[in-house]
Design a protein with these regions (language model features):
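Conserved beta-strand signature within the Rossmann-like core of class I S-adenosyl-L-methionine
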Residues: 210-218
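Short internal loop-to-helix segment that lines adenine-nucleotide cofactor pockets
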Residues: 56-79, 121, 125, 137-139, ...
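Active-site flanking residues adjacent to catalytic metal/cofactor-binding acidic residues
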Residues: 81, 102, 190, 215-216
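S-adenosyl-L-methionine
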Residues: 1-119, 156, 161-165, 179-181, ...
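Polar, low-complexity loop segments and adjacent catalytic/binding residues used for recognizing
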Residues: 136-146
Length: 279
């Protein structure tokens, strides 16, 4: 009870802080430009997660970028599902042949487009769609305080997903197997706030050909957004992957043993920003 109250107060204070920044800068200020280690990036000043870290610390996700760069070469083709504003895409693009980037949130997509231009990144193609199991129109909520947390309308829309009163819009979604002309990627990164399950349902062909899959794993997303079990989630991981690395635990296991570890993590409400499946 006390823990839940703590988080509600925390979310409330974040929302107030974001609104205060917006008032101080004025409604006409849609982005500020940060010269960061990730690149020259336009960020929403109201964003207190990725945007805040870029503004305050001058970087975001450098450890993850290093891990990804160790898994690709200058000849690699990479698919990023959930590109946000490009803080990972832009540095990764410097070390591979090509990146295809998917971003469903139109506000984030506009910043992504701006940031590619600011960094003169020419080997990234971007698509303002949602990845799903089929072609459909989905309800999508656009968070401001944590714009990277924007997501498909959860089946169980907990307070933690809606504390900043996100606008809910219609977004066109597609099976990536059907939408993308290209289906050969060396590395695929999926981080779409609980919709990973639906995306993987619609990209069986693409997944079957990749060498490395990195996918977010958060128990509350599996439960509230997708409403699926760990077993259902893992059923979509192609069988040619034999190893699972869990960066948050600094552990690598055979996939079958890794599945047991993930179930334990789910039971303990422990997540990981990017599980790594490899051959």
């Amino acid at each position: 009870m006390l823990k839940a109250l703590f988080w509600r107060i925390n979310f409330f204070l974040k929302n107030r802080k974001s609104a205060k920044i917006n008032r101080q800068l004025g409604n006409g200020v849609k982005s500020v430009i940060v010269d960061s280690k990730n690149g020259l990036l336009a960020v929403d000043p109201r964003d207190l997660e990725v945007g805040f870290k870029l503004r305050k610390y001058g970087s975001y996700g450098l450890e993850e970028i290093t891990r990804i760069n160790e898994l690709i070469t200058t000849e690699s083709n990479v698919l990023v599902v959930g590109a946000h504003i490009g803080s990972l895409v832009i540095p990764i693009a410097k070390n591979c042949n090509k990146v295809v980037a998917i971003e469903a949130n139109p506000n984030n997509f506009n910043l992504l487009k701006t940031n590619l231009h600011l960094n003169k990144t020419e080997n990234v193609s971007i698509h303002n769609i949602a990845a799903s199991s089929k072609q459909e129109t989905i309800k999508f909520q656009m968070n401001v305080v944590n714009s990277g947390g924007s997501k498909r309308l959860p089946k169980n829309n907990e307070y933690m997903y809606r504390y900043d009163n996100p606008e809910v819009i219609d977004v066109q979604a597609y099976s990536l197997d059907e939408y993308l002309d290209e289906n050969n990627f060396d590395l695929i990164l999926i981080d779409i706030e609980g919709s990973e399950y639906f995306a993987m349902q619609g990209m069986e062909k693409i997944l079957s050909k990749c060498n490395t899959l990195i996918v977010e794993f958060l128990p509350h997303h599996l439960k509230n957004v997708a409403d699926v079990s760990v077993e259902q989630f893992l059923s979509l991981i192609p069988q040619h992957f034999t190893k699972l690395t869990i960066p948050s635990k600094n552990e690598t296991h055979p996939v079958d043993i890794g599945g047991v570890v993930l179930q334990q993590m789910y039971n303990n409400k422990e997540g990981d920003d990017g599980l790594i499946f490899t051959k």
